Every structure is written in C-alpha cells, then in structure tokens.
Design a protein with these regions (language model features):
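Bergerat-fold GHKL ATPase/HATPase_c domain
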Residues: 1-39
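Conserved beta-strand-loop-beta-strand hairpin that lines the nucleotide-binding pocket
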Residues: 1-9, 52-136
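Conserved small-residue
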Residues: 20, 47-50, 105
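A broad, low-specificity signal for short, low-complexity segments enriched in glycine/proline
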Residues: 25-29, 36-41, 73-75, 85-89
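Conserved ATP-binding N-box helix of the HATPase_c
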Residues: 35-59
Length: 136
C-alpha cells in the first residue's frame, strides 16, 4: 500500500528523543517496514535531538514528526519553531564531540533537506529507500 501518513507531536525535551524513536519503530512495524526501523530510528534520533537542542530557543514548545510512505520511499519530517538558523551539513574537527548528526542522516538517506514553515520554524525532511519487505 502506498500513501500512508502518520503525524505525532512531542514536547521539546530530551525525554522526547527516545519516545520519538520508539514511535517510529511502532509505526514502521505496523506498516510492515520493520527492516527500516534501525535506520529510521537513528535519523529521527538525530533530527529530534537537533530540534530539542536548537529549537528550545524558538517560540514553540513542540516538535512535529511526520512519517509518509509513498512510491517506494519513506519520508521522515521533523518540524520545529526555530527559524533563525537552518541546519547545514558540516564536517566537525576530530576532537569535537558533537556535530555529526547530519553526516549520519546524509549517509543513510537518498536525499534530505530543509524548508521554512509557514509562520515560524522549519521542517527537516529525509527520504529513506524502501528496499525490500513491507507492503507495496
């Protein structure tokens, strides 16, 4: 089946990161996409961690997680209210202890990007290939 969508909202707090990961795992198992659980959970972990870290300076207190299954692609979107700085891929120095999240996202995804939201904030989107298994 194509065209499935799931939308969930979480508070901008560190406790939401594992909740968002578990939510993704539950949804993907329900959609018979269990083979994507690890990749999708890692992507969601990185994106929600970034939202919690940076969007706490924004005007809202929630993030939105959207999962979409369409045309052989799982689309993962994380939206928040922080609009002053858009995420960009960078290569951290070896001694830095953070800054590698988008490198992981880039390595796991077919494509990813960021777009501003209407009103305030941004959405970071990621396309993961549905390589095998699951409903088609």
């Amino acid at each position: 089946m194509s065209g499935r969508t799931n939308i969930a909202r979480f508070r901008l707090s560190k406790a939401s990161v594992p909740r968002a990961r578990e939510h993704v795992r539950l949804v993907l198992r329900e959609w018979k996409l269990g083979h994507l659980c690890d990749e999708a959970a890692l992507v969601v972990s990185e994106l929600t961690t970034n939202a919690v870290t940076h969007a706490a300076q924004g005007i809202g207190d929630q993030l939105e997680l959207v999962l979409r299954r369409r045309d052989g692609v799982l689309v993962v979107e994380v939206s928040d209210s922080y609009q002053w700085e858009m995420p960009e891929l960078r290569k951290p120095a070896p001694e830095e202890t953070s800054g590698r999240g988008l490198l992981l996202v880039d390595a796991l995804s077919q494509a990813w990007g960021v777009r501003p939201r209407t009103g305030a904030g941004k959405t970071v989107w990621v396309h993961l290939a549905v390589r095998h298994g699951g409903e088609e």
